[in-house]
């Protein structure tokens, strides 16, 4: 039953992208901070954070926000490779800020409460956004990427807020309902689809039959591939368990050192490397039974491990050679992967700093949980 959330969150993200929600979020946040140094880059990051709270997908976030913001940043003098790299990095927040498709997968595999994972992922997602905004500010200051000539007036801010109100309300309804216990994450995914459809068709009036058809089609195609990955990965994970591979790997890691700090560092490095080559869904299904017992054995809570695992694999989305966010941003911006790779290094380092904070300071993930 929890896996049913995946296709519905995918569909909701597609409907919102086609329904003009991303554009209105951009206009609102641009009116707030578009005038500061690096303002457009920061707007891109914040909109990615909001869109993440709607779609639960990194690729959907990069596609929806990047198509609008990369050309906008370039038109205001931003370096195109940097604009694309920043968007690719910000897209990783899509699987950390709830709702999150990888959290659903991890919750099913590990038996961890999906609602707890959604609650715990909120603060780390915000931390990732802040870290990227700090990078954006200093890079913009160094290269002269200035904001708008003048700040928006209160009347202009109010106008963009009214236009974006229903878009802003969407994550409030979805996450508020989950956190309050009013509905489950799976039910929230269905409500998200209904809400997106109503807003796109009847409020913003930008979602037509063609757009709705394409949204359903894209969701079906992506979910089909996802379902196959889940099926085959589950079988492979069961085979590894029967062959006692998890026990062998655990003994190998624990044989290297008994120091909890070093064990977590080794696991993080391993997961970062895996994330560069393997999609997050099969990686989560295969590696959770192997690594979770090791981490819980040294005192880490399963929720914290789930955030750490997902964040590692998310960073892989924008890491060469096979980071999917890089390819999406490259396709949108027409910038080569080689150019993107050079510009992604600083955002990647910022995300890794947040990862280490999450790993070694459990309060960042457990602060909103009464556990």
Describe each model-derived feature in a short phrase.
Residues 1-371:
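Alpha-helical transmembrane segments of multi-pass membrane transport proteins
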């Amino acid at each position: 039953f929890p896996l049913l959330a995946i296709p519905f969150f995918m569909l909701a993200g597609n409907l919102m992208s086609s329904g003009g929600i991303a554009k209105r979020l951009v206009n609102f946040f641009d009116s707030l901070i578009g005038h500061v140094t690096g303002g457009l880059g920061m707007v891109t990051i914040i909109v990615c954070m909001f869109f993440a709270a709607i779609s639960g997908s990194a690729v959907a976030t990069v596609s929806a926000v990047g198509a609008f913001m990369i050309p906008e940043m370039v038109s205001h003098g931003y370096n195109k490779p940097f604009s694309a790299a920043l968007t690719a990095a910000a897209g990783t927040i899509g699987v950390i800020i709830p709702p999150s498709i990888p959290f659903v997968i991890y919750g099913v595999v590990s038996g961890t409460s999906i609602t707890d994972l959604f609650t715990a992922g909120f603060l780390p997602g915000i931390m990732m956004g802040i870290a990227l905004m700090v990078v954006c500010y200093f890079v913009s200051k160094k290269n002269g990427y200035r904001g708008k000539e003048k700040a928006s007036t209160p009347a202009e801010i109010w106008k963009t807020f009214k236009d974006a109100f229903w878009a802003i309300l969407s994550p409030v309804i979805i996450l508020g309902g989950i956190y309050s216990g009013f509905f489950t994450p799976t039910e929230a995914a269905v409500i998200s689809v209904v809400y997106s459809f109503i807003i796109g068709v009847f409020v913003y009036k930008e979602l037509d039959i063609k757009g709705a058809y394409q949204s359903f089609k894209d969701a079906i195609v992506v979910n089909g591939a996802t379902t196959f990955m889940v099926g085959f990965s589950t079988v492979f994970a069961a085979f590894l368990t029967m062959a006692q591979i998890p026990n062998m790997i655990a003994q190998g890691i624990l044989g290297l050192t008994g120091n909890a700090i070093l064990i977590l560092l080794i696991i993080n490095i391993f997961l970062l490397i895996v994330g560069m080559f393997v999609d997050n869904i099969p990686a989560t299904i295969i590696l959770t039974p192997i690594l979770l017992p090791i981490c819980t054995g040294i005192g880490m809570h399963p929720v914290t491990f789930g955030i750490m695992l997902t964040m590692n694999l998310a960073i892989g989305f924008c890491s060469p050679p096979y980071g999917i966010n890089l390819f999406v941003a490259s396709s949108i911006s027409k910038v080569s992967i080689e150019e993107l790779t050079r510009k992604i290094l600083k955002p990647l380092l910022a995300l890794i700093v947040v990862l280490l904070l999450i790993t070694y300071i459990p309060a960042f993930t457990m602060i909103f949980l009464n556990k």
